Amino acid sequence: MKTIKFRILRLVCLLSITGGAAAAQVVPPTWTAQDALGRTIGTDAQYGKPRPGKTVGMFFVVWHGAHGYDHYEARPDMDVIVPGKNDTLSPYDIQKLLDERPDAPQYGPVGAFHHWGEPYLGYYVANDEWVIRKHAQMLSDAGVDVIIIDMTNEVIYLPIVTKLMEVYRKMRSEGNRTPQISCVFHTLLPNGKETLKKMYDNIYSKGLYEELWFRWQGKPLVFCPREALTPEMDAFFTTRHCWFDSREPWFRDGQRCCPWADYYPQNYGWDEDPNVAEMMSVAPATHPTDRRDRVQRIGRSFHNGRQPLTEAEQRSGEGLHFNEQFSRAMEVDPDFLFFTGWNEWSAMRFINQGEILTLANNECKIGDSYFCDDYNHEYSRDIEPLRGGFGDNYYYQLCDFIRRYKGVEPIEVHSDIHRIDPGDMTTWQQVKAVYADDRGDTFHRDHFGYGRIGQLINTTGRNDIVEAKMANDGKTLWFYVRTDRPITSCTDPKWMRLFIDVKGSGLPDWEGFQYAVGNPAADESKTALSRSRNGWNWEKIADLDYRVSDNEMVVAVPFAAIGVKNPKNFTVDFKWIDNAVDQGDIQQCLSDGDAAPNGRFRYRYIFEQQPDKTR
């Protein structure tokens, strides 16, 4: 082990480095990632240049906590209900019930909502601001343009939707990104048209949150048949009829239609020309049941025309059906992809009266229980990360799909050599390799959860990273990071760690990173450089000097220490993590502390030295 030093000359305040320079923008399409299966998300070299006119929508649910907990309950305002003292059993997690008693799961009461699994963010309710913020961030990072709020059950959940829009507005005022908003209605139900009218009367006609409305063909888009509109609404909205299964009569010839889910190979909806695809759905799965009038049991492992019916055969975490549906969408190449969905998470328990033939892998007899839309890890269609099971696989598969569909801007290639003075922050002013992170994503959580869960608290947000920079002087990589407020003490646990992936190294790694800085923790003048011995097993190989000044931090890592063999041409991915990741669980970057960039993503620095033309 060796000690690597740099000399500290002087300290300069933050004002000197920012001195009028435009703030860097958060640009997720330039980030890279590696998921738990080793699948990579790359850059424009993998996906090609941007394809203008491609739009992504995501089916989005806001019913969590609005229909009671241990028992079904409906209130006139359809707001989230505060759990009562008698809510001692829910959430009913079907996957856990099956794991405990596969042949006789102990379901909750008839009519009660049951979860198919546990969200990574916990069993939440829909008005938890911390969750709303996390969802907006994850969806924006993925490239989702619009969430399509489910109002197909004749309920608009007005207090919850209003809370969501208020949070989105607040996030935007803070400089952060959110998707736009649209809604989907089932106007063929008895009160379906009235549901649409309520949303129009309460939000659209009043011009509320207009900056959040998603527009298509110049007008706010809602998913419902045009004939459901009054003349006033018809002049106001663009509409697309939206329901399940393009083989059903509602779809007609497909004009101005868009299924929220469909069987492979999916059909597309069109607007003026039947030969021009406008919209198409893509889903990880459809339903857990076969009905007397249709075969619809399609789980996450369905592919090549077959649903595996034993757990040994099922590959729920690989996204086989999801990939098949997306491949079909890329063949057709519509202007709008409708992904179903993000966060349904639960379904009501019903008793079979003879209409259902199978539930999941088993026969469903008269008098047996069944669940319409979701059941367990295999028979569910949410993309939001799961706790346990397949984790965040579907989220990063979504990110990959959207980049394939939209293309991405070319990532910048750097050629400048910079002489960095670690004591003079003004030397960073000319550095062009600048990477931004969301401001305010250390927001603390303190909100009641679902049913018996109690208060969900997360106060791990600490150092809010807002900007990173990287430079090299021909022998050393220099890393700079800036936080929103003064950086906390180095004695804090899991403090300001930097992870480095030298592309092409071939060395053992943790989540693709061969090296870590600050793992173990630093003292006030030195920090450890460690290398992975395979996974979260680190060996210290050197000490590095580093410097913290108020809300800025600089650390230097020599090429030789991390195996950069060609100083004129190399690529490095890197990631800052503060107060997250215990025992190697990188998914904690979705929920704890702060990571720059978010989740599993990492920044990429490409260096290609230009030839000296003076010689």
For each feature predicted by the language model, list its residue ranges.
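Beta-strand-rich interaction surfaces with strong enrichment in secreted/lumenal proteins
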Residues: 466-469, 541-546
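Acidic, glycine-anchored loop motifs typical of Ca2+
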Residues: 418-452, 506
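Glycan-processing catalytic domains of CAZymes
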Residues: 25-418, 424, 432, 487, ...
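Bacterial N-terminal signal peptides
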Residues: 9-20
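N-terminal secretory signal peptides that target proteins for export/translocation
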Residues: 1-6
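Acidic/polar low-complexity flexible segments
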Residues: 412-429, 499-522, 561-615
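Short, well-ordered beta-strand segments enriched in hydrophobic/aromatic residues
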Residues: 423, 475-485, 552-559
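Short coil-to-beta strand junction motifs in C2/discoidin
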Residues: 490-497
